[in-house]
C-alpha cells in the first residue's frame, strides 16, 4: 500500500495550510453581505434580517462538521411481527381475560 503524502491529503480534503477560523470568517462575511444585499431593496430592516440569515446559515453549516456522525438511538423501531419492534406484541400479550 502506498503512503499518503501531505499533497495527496490537501488534494483529497482541500485542507491546505489555511486556518479554519479564517475560512469561517470569510464565509460569514460573504454570506452576510449576500443576505444584506438581497434584503436591501426592502429597506434597512430587511437588509439586517438578510445579514442575520446569512450569519445563521454559516453557523449552521459550520455546526454540521462538529456534530456526531453515528449516534445510536435506543428506540426500537419496526414491526413487532419480525422481532424488531418495541417488544409489545398484542397477539401474545394477555389482556387479563384469563385462559
Swiss-Prot record:
Signal sequence span per UniProt?
Answer: 1-15
Alphabetical keyword list: Antibiotic, Antimicrobial, Bacteriocin, Ion channel, Ion transport, Signal, Transport
**What spans are recorded as compositionally biased (Low complexity)?**
87-99
Q: Does the keyword Ion transport apply?
A: yes
Quaternary structure note: Multimer. Possibly forms a homodimer or a homotrimer.
Concerning its family, UniProt says: Belongs to the class IIa microcin family.
**Name assigned to this protein:** Microcin E492
The protein's organism comes out as Klebsiella pneumoniae
What gene is this protein translated from? mceA
